[in-house]
Every structure is written in C-alpha cells, then in structure tokens.
Amino acid sequence: MLIDITLRITPKMATDAQGNERKAMVGHLGTHFDVMDKDFPLEFTRRRGIVFDVADIGGRDIDIPDIELSKVEGGMFVAFRTGFIESQGYGGKVYFSAHPQLSNALIDALLDRNVSIIGVDFAGIRRGGEHTPADQRCANRGAFVIENLCNLKAVVEAGGACVMHTYPMNFAGMTGLPCRVIAEM
C-alpha cells in the first residue's frame, strides 16, 4: 500500500500562505526541505522509515521519552505525526509561529543515530530564530528536515514502519526544495 504524505497545494492555499510569494520563489511552499548548503543524495530517495505518533503531546517540546528511540536506526527517515497540519490548516500565522517543535535533545539523539531525514507535519523542527540553525545543525550531520507532511495518521494506523520514497525537485539556486514523499507500507 502506498500513502502520499505530501501536502497538496491548491491555488487558495498558495494565495493564503503567510509570505507566500517569497516562500514560493525560494521553494518553501508546501512539503519541502530547506537545502542549507548540501545536495540531496540520490540514495536518500529510498529510506527505511518510521512515523512516531506524538499527537498527544502539547504545551511542551516533543522529547526523547515521547518516542521509542530504540526503533531508530542509522539511515532512517524518522517522521513525527502531531496532527497539527490537520487541526490548524496549512499557511496561517499560528501554523508558522506556534507549531510544535522537537527538543534539542531529541534532535541530537536522532543525529547521534545517523538518521538521513527528519520529517514533521508542521512548519519546522524548531520555531522562530532557532529554525534555520536547527536545520543547519542537521545538514552538518548529514540529515535533511522535511516540513509540512500530511496524512501521517494513515501511516501510523498501518503500523508506522514503512519505506519512505522522497523525490525533491532538481532546482538550483533555491533555499528550499519542494518534494513528493510517499510511504510504502
């Protein structure tokens, strides 16, 4: 079974997205990853994956005790389902400024396990001024962060473990790359 976990962008969503023209011009609209200063390796297009359901976490960062870290292995695509994209909708001020975030300890634990990709169903693994430095820290350790995933509940309901297929656009000179992400159960 294949589950598309890519956010489908409608013309209305593109129009309504906060700062949409700037975001679209540099590849940050919808499901995408921030390029930082790295190239996406072709071997990352197919990764063993796992989706952790952390939808019950609220009012604090998502942290190491909230997941089964022992299930995370090197090279994996590790995604977090919070339900935020479904509850808030994509593109508004709250979506971009008050989204969940991963604790720095959890980010470091994932990087210590040499994950390839960290995926989230919200606007970034850290908020505000911590967003870009967190993405760069991941890039420096060989991991990419994919933002604005959707349909992760279906992956969780199908067991959570899967093969993730990630296909970024082959654009040059962009700070973000839109991508299509499919979970193969």
Feature map (PLM): residue ranges:
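Active-/binding-site microenvironments in catalytic and ligand-binding cores
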Residues: 1-185
